[in-house]
Amino acid sequence: MAAHVSTGNIHNFYLAGQVYRGQAFSWSSASTFMANPFKEPSWSSGVFKALKAERCGCYSRGISPISETSKPIRAVSVSSSTKYYDFTVIGSGVAGLRYALEVAKQGTVAVITKDEPHESNTNYAQGGVSAVLCPLDSVESHMRDTMVAGAHLCDEETVRVVCTEGPERIRELIAMGASFDHGEDGNLHLAREGGHSHCRIVHAADMTGREIERALLEAVLNDPNISVFKHHFAIDLLTSQDGLNTVCHGVDTLNIKTNEVVRFISKVTLLASGGAGHIYPSTTNPLVATGDGMAMAHRAQAVISNMEFVQFHPTALADEGLPIKLQTARENAFLITEAVRGDGGILYNLGMERFMPVYDERAELAPRDVVARSIDDQLKKRNEKYVLLDISHKPREKILAHFPNIASECLKHGLDITRQPIPVVPAAHYMCGGVRAGLQGETNVLGLFVAGEVACTGLHGANRLASNSLLEALVFARRAVQPSTELMKRTRLDVCASEKWTRPVVATARLLGDEVIAKIIALTKEVRRELQEVMWKYVGIVRSTIRLTTAERKIAELEAKWETFLFEHGWEQTVVALEACEMRNLFCCAKLVVSSALARHESRGLHYMTDFPFVEESKRIPTIILPSSPTTASWSSRRLQNISSSSLIDC
């Protein structure tokens, strides 16, 4: 487990069972807090100034990796196994691509993606992007909706920034060729979704993410300063220590097609690798969402926050309720967008009783956490497998125009959504927590920026408002550009730097033998399923201290069993393989979620505890996980490479 889990705000925070009181806090080392009674910061202006100043030198300290102004470098390959770029971007969703297009104006960019470039959470996003574009709407209204949905754990400054800058980010997408739906008056058609008090969802039917991904990816592939490396799995970040400062210099990757390790050395790294939906057995996320970025950042000494807040989307398609059953199980659950309820969809149990008004006066338009818990309660009380979402009372042409993708998918399996209700069930959807970031995407690791689902910016609080995810990714990807380019211009790289870290070794038949590799892969698949079942059973929509401590114990036992098998069969600290590296990241993220959940003794937003069923004002504070100790951690929590303490500016 993480070495330290704590919660903190401007009034008090909790660390290792002790309570400290003050008005602010900052870091004095990698594992302790210091209280400062003289300032009263918000999430962004205070806590992140502490992160930025104490851990990152405010991007102006004369620490070793920062030098006088340097020129952008050309993309250099010292060998096929080492590449040098000004910027490395890990992830090819909306955050990574939008950032890459901007920083490419200043230098060379490597975009590293685990699968095909389009295979990201962005590509699966159906609903849209929320933005204040209607004269009847206002930034204040969008802010209020965001903070109410987030159970008032959101940072107000972050919320204001995102809601204010959102409309301009939409206009930029349109200028880049993204095509969104328009109404009969020629203006953008703005939909409404749960938790929103106004129509403000910009969308492209029910395939908004796919359209945004198309436009951005087309621009990226045509940019001469950007190189896209597909099928490259990010293993671990490359870091060095300068006093108390951790500095990021790039990333090691595994070329999945050639089974070779490729090292990327860069002046700036953006982590935009998405979420960790596959710690659960049913998720709307694609197979690539195994928490790689969050786990890598944690191992690299980045601060992690609010991991207990896992959003379960209330309405994923329940395949067992379809007239024509699937021949093989899906790799990820098919999402039924929030917009169906926003357009008037009604939820019924299998007895055709409408139930949402019983739980919340907002009924089907309540925030996702409320709707998911309500459905979960119905399923448990009635011992049923799914509920029904009915939109068939709306005009057929309107349904098919707004939800063509959903209609087509359901029709494949014998269900006509214009006449029949849709069977739905909650599924893991979005991580509201992640790598703690400031208003410019900065982290406590110098040279490492984050954007998108991998980040915890303070926007979502305890529950994300529908269609705020793509919005956040766009805003923070753009805000990270200026500090990134400034840092790039002040940073020089050693062309010999690649050899300053131990290189990972690929698990091959020559190294371990075919039989051993087959056994390891088989066990890893089995352990992955077991971990997912533990997370769903004990760390799902409704939790308790007993369930969480049970999960903690079972995960530790499962991880020990898996790691023991590996290392008894010739595995070593630096050995890598795709299945094993994904498993280590899933273990790491699962432990972060459980640790955070155990630290929050209240029910707030997505975190509902049966033994702490009420919101407590004194606990309206973020959960913080400090870096773990590499000497006592399991393999999933240790970096593969030895950290170099030497300067990387020898040239």
Swiss-Prot record:
Protein's UniProt name: L-aspartate oxidase, chloroplastic
Family as reported in the entry's similarity comment: Belongs to the FAD-dependent oxidoreductase 2 family. NadB subfamily.
Lineage, highest ranks first: Eukaryota, Viridiplantae, Streptophyta, Embryophyta, Tracheophyta
Domain of life: Eukaryota
Enzyme class (EC, first level): oxidoreductase
GO CC list: chloroplast
Description of the deletion phenotype: Embryonic lethality when homozygous.
Residues binding FAD, per UniProt: 92-95, 114, 121-128, 292, 453, 469-470
Pathway of action: Cofactor biosynthesis; NAD(+) biosynthesis; iminoaspartate from L-aspartate (oxidase route): step 1/1
